[in-house]
């Protein structure tokens, strides 16, 4: 668990700014705690994916994609911290691909979950407005392509920088600066986009009815979304601020790497105190927001959703959605009376699915038959 001695003849990079200052039992205890937390999250997500099969939900949906990304993220973080039980030196001398996989790729997975949250809440808005704005359907494909391109850009930048930073002739400071600038700018932009979606949802009572029919609520969505936005934005802003500081300034942070909240790739090795701070920051800025996302997309029993206490007794989710008196609480919902035959999409009964295309006319017809 001790940091190896510095040998200036073997490495031209800057020497560590820290000396071992944390007792070995403290580091061992923290490593155990970190690993247990990640393993617990891994086990919980694994159970959720099995429940998808048990309750016969759709196997390819927003829910399953989110859960799979979180499962992969938790497994990579657990493997990384397991190195620090006996292989502390190996954890700081990884090859280019292994370094990218354990240190960089989990950050990419978190960005992917943020983009998927944007797409999911944008879909909720589309569902609520597609009745009187059917032309919105033509913007769905460009929106998906835009977020796909952004995600690929994020992935390529991280992979390229991770490979370059491991080369002997690389300008590590420049490479890390470019990566941090691009990554955190994209994080901030996606966070702003998500905040706009949440604001629109909070102003549309019909979107709230849809979320309630899925076992959630506008209040729950807003709380989780705002928390994730604040955590990711604060992390990105911190990284950008540190990026703007001079060498003398960020050395005074007493961290043995440059981008303390992201990856340990500017200086040669993590120091003892730096390792402690690294784990704590990952817990606050990674484990906590990821756990919130997992909680929101957890698997619910379809039978329990049908008897949700928020539903009007005697109505199923579909009739509750169309008959709910709160749908006229806002100007957006009043517009649903304008063109009752123009709806091109509707809220399907499948949980967190990619989309159903049942017509509004068929649903209103069935409701009229039920009323007669």
From Swiss-Prot:
Domain of life: Eukaryota
TM segment ranges: 33-53, 65-85, 94-114, 145-165, 174-194, 223-243, 277-297
Residue positions with a glycan: 11, 259
Keyword Cell cycle appears in the UniProt entry: no
Cellular compartments annotated: Lysosome membrane
A GO cellular-component term linked to this record: lysosomal membrane
Stretches in topological domain Lumenal: 1-32, 86-93, 166-173, 244-276
A GO BP entry: positive regulation of protein localization to lysosome
UniProtKB keywords: Autophagy, Glycoprotein, Lysosome, Membrane, Transmembrane, Transmembrane helix
Membrane topology, as annotated: Multi-pass membrane protein
CDD domains, per database record: 7tm_GPR137B (cd21476)
UniProt topological domain (Cytoplasmic) ranges: 54-64, 115-144, 195-222, 298-372
Protein task: Lysosomal integral membrane protein that regulates the localization and activity of mTORC1, a signaling complex promoting cell growth in response to growth factors, energy levels, and amino acids. Interacts with Rag GTPases and increases the lysosomial localization and activity of Rag GTPases and thereby regulates mTORC1 translocation and activity in lysosome. Involved in the regulation of lysosomal morphology and autophagy. Also acts as a negative regulator of osteoclast activity. Also acts as a negative regulator of osteoclast activity.
Record-stated family: Belongs to the GPR137 family.
Protein name per its UniProtKB record: Integral membrane protein GPR137B
Organism: Xenopus laevis (African clawed frog)
Lineage, top ranks: Eukaryota, Metazoa, Chordata, Craniata, Vertebrata
């Amino acid at each position: 668990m001790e940091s190896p001695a510095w040998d200036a003849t073997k490495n031209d990079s800057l020497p560590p700014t820290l000396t071992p200052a944390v007792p070995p039992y403290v580091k061992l205890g923290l490593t155990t705690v970190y690993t247990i937390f990640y393993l617990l999250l891994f086990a919980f997500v694994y159970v959720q994916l099995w429940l998808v099969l048990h309750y016969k939900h759709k196997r390819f949906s927003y829910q399953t994609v989110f859960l799979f990304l979180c499962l992969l993220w938790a497994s990579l973080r657990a493997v990384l911290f397991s190195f620090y039980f006996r292989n502390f030196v190996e954890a700081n001398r990884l090859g280019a691909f292994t370094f990218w996989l354990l240190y960089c790729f989990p950050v990419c997975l978190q960005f992917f979950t943020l983009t998927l949250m944007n797409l999911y809440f944008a879909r909720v808005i589309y569902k609520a407005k597609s009745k009187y704005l059917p032309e919105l359907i033509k913007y769905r494909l460009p929106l998906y392509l835009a977020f796909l391109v952004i995600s690929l850009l994020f992935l390529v930048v991280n992979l390229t920088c991770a490979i370059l930073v491991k080369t002997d002739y690389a300008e590590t400071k420049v490479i890390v600066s470019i990566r941090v600038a691009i990554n955190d700018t994209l994080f901030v932009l996606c966070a702003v986009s998500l905040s706009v979606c949440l604001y629109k949802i909070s102003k549309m009572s019909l979107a709230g009815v849809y979320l309630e029919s899925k076992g959630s609520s506008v209040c729950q969505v807003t709380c989780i979304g705002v928390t994730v936005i604040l955590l990711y934005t604060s992390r990105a802003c911190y990284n950008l601020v540190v990026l703007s500081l001079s060498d003398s300034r960020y050395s005074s942070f007493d961290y043995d790497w440059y981008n303390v909240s992201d990856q340990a790739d500017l200086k040669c090795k993590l120091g003892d105190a730096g390792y402690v701070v690294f784990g704590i920051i990952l817990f606050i800025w990674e484990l906590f927001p990821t756990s919130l996302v997992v909680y929101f997309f957890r698997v619910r029993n379809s039978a329990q959703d049908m008897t949700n206490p928020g539903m009007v007794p005697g109505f199923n989710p579909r009739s509750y959605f169309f008959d709910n008196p709160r749908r006229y609480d806002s100007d957006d919902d009043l517009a649903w009376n304008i063109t009752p035959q123009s709806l091109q999409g509707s809220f399907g009964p499948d949980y967190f699915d990619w989309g159903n295309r049942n017509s509004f006319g068929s649903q209103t017809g069935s409701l009229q038959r039920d009323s007669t």
